[in-house]
């Protein structure tokens, strides 16, 4: 009589940006090579991986709370392995502090050595606890693993790190200086993903617009987009994040000319005041940013623009804040990701005078959200009566009886439809809208 071996289960939790999600997928795939299968049930897991974020204090507090919650699972199942990785662990001096706070964790890894996770997991299984954080990246290595194989949508790293050093941002300190992947490696990964069923890729980098500046040949982000656009079987190409100072006319024209390059640009402006932009070390002015927006709208008239905004940066006056609100009204973003400034240890902004009180930051954030919600609603209401191409992603989270997907402009659409439409491109007539969602009726499918 043969005994069927029950596979071990891994649950991976990702916090923070899309790059953190991509790293979490990589860690999951590495675990699968050790025989683990993906699961969503923490109580049944044999391995729990938490890939962390440290961009804002609120994110860190949420992660620390989750790590604390895992302690009772470890007590109930001493064979359970818990691994914590990513940006929070990579911060200078963080490892010792975190290990003292969470002695139940088995594996600690930073951002530079996630491709070493199989070795770390083996060491933890054989010897017990292991902690390894590389101070600097030793190589630009992207695993051949297809971290998102079989998925409709995938994130693909094109570069790592950042050279901009915005004064509020911890990312260059935990991700290192900018390193571009070789284009052949990126294109090979995307082609392989398409073979497994992927139809949309999002190219990731802290600043995709500066991709290629460290390569040994003249090859920039626009060149990469052209090559990705030509891959057979790929329906959509997105990218993030773009730094305004590096957004060239060549890049805008490439997006406009592309077949599969989505008419959506995420272009963070962060603040509408030149004084605050200077303090942030953003390396552009309000006027320059608006000139880039104007050029985008001329070359890509149907473009959907999204952005990131920070309120309450040190020294921000009411006049500075009003300039931010005015810029929002002028540009008309379809969506904005809004945040209160969060002091990050080790960044120049953390040492600046005139730190803004929390109550003022909260008030400004609420004002900002109110203004942007009105802009988002107006943008979406203008789409009522139009027919949009939608990539169907799955059941709606708010109403499982309906399907959901996104337009090329990244607008979320909810509509009635059968499950067999998932993974296809359909035409949806937009009939209603709120500030966040379009509602419609499926008229035809393309693929």
Swiss-Prot record:
EC numbers on record: 2.8.4.3
Residues covered by the Radical SAM core domain: 148-378
Gene Ontology CC, one term: cytosol
SUPFAM superfamilies: Radical SAM enzymes
Gene Ontology molecular function terms on file: 4 iron, 4 sulfur cluster binding; metal ion binding; N6-isopentenyladenosine methylthiotransferase activity
Assigned keywords, A-Z: 4Fe-4S, Cytoplasm, Iron, Iron-sulfur, Metal-binding, S-adenosyl-L-methionine, Transferase, tRNA processing
Keyword RNA-binding part of the UniProt annotation: no
Reactions it catalyzes: N(6)-dimethylallyladenosine(37) in tRNA + (sulfur carrier)-SH + AH2 + 2 S-adenosyl-L-methionine = 2-methylsulfanyl-N(6)-dimethylallyladenosine(37) in tRNA + (sulfur carrier)-H + 5'-deoxyadenosine + L-methionine + A + S-adenosyl-L-homocysteine + 2 H(+)
Domain named TRAM: residues: 381-444
Family the UniProt entry places it in: Belongs to the methylthiotransferase family. MiaB subfamily.
Binding partners and assembly: Monomer.
Name of the protein described by the UniProt record: tRNA-2-methylthio-N(6)-dimethylallyladenosine synthase
Organism from which the protein derives: Desulfitobacterium hafniense (strain Y51)
Organism classification: Bacteria, Bacillati, Bacillota, Clostridia, Eubacteriales
């Amino acid at each position: 009589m043969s005994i069927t071996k029950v596979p071990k289960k891994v649950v991976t939790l990702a916090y923070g940006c899309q790059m953190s999600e991509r790293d979490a997928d990589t860690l999951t795939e590495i675990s699968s090579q050790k025989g683990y299968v993906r699961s969503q049930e923490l109580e049944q897991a044999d391995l729990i991986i938490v890939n962390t974020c440290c961009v804002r204090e609120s994110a860190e507090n949420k992660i620390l709370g989750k790590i604390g919650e895992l302690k009772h699972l470890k007590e109930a199942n001493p064979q359970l392995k818990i691994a914590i990785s990513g940006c929070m662990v990579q911060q200078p001096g963080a490892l010792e502090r975190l290990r003292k706070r969470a002695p139940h964790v088995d594996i600690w890894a930073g951002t530079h050595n996630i491709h070493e996770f199989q070795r770390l997991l083996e060491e933890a299984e054989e010897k017990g606890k292991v902690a390894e954080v590389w101070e600097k990246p030793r190589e630009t290595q992207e695993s051949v693993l297809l971290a998102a194989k079989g998925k409709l949508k995938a994130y693909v790293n094109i570069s790592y790190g950042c050279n901009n050093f915005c004064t509020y941002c911890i990312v260059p300190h935990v991700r290192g200086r900018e390193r571009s992947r070789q284009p052949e490696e990126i294109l090979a990964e995307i082609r392989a993903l398409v073979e497994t069923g992927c139809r949309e890729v999002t190219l990731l980098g802290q600043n995709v617009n500066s991709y290629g500046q460290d390569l040994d040949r003249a090859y920039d982000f626009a060149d990469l987009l052209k090559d990705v656009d030509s891959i057979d079987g790929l329906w959509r190409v997105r990218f993030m994040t773009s730094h305004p100072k590096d957004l060239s006319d060549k890049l805008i024209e490439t997006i406009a000319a592309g077949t599969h390059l989505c008419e959506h640009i995420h272009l963070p402006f962060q603040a509408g005041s030149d004084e605050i932009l200077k303090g942030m070390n953003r390396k552009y002015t309000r006027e320059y940013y608006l000139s880039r927006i104007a050029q985008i709208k001329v070359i890509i008239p149907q473009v959907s623009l999204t952005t990131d905004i920070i309120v309450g940066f040190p020294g921000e006056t009411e006049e500075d804040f009003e300039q931010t609100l005015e810029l929002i009204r002028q540009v008309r973003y379809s969506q904005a990701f809004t945040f209160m400034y969060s002091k990050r240890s080790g960044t120049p902004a953390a040492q600046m005078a005139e730190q803004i009180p929390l109550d003022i930051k909260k008030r400004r954030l609420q004002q900002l959200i109110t203004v942007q919600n009105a802009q988002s609603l107006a943008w979406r209401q203008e789409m009522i009566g139009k027919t949009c191409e939608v990539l169907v992603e799955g059941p709606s989270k708010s109403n499982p009886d309906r399907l959901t997907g996104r337009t090329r402009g990244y607008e979320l659409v909810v509509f009635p439809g059968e499950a067999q439409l998932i993974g296809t491109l359909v035409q949806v007539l937009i009939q209603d809208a709120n500030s966040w969602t379009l509602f419609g009726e499926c008229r035809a499918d393309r693929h």
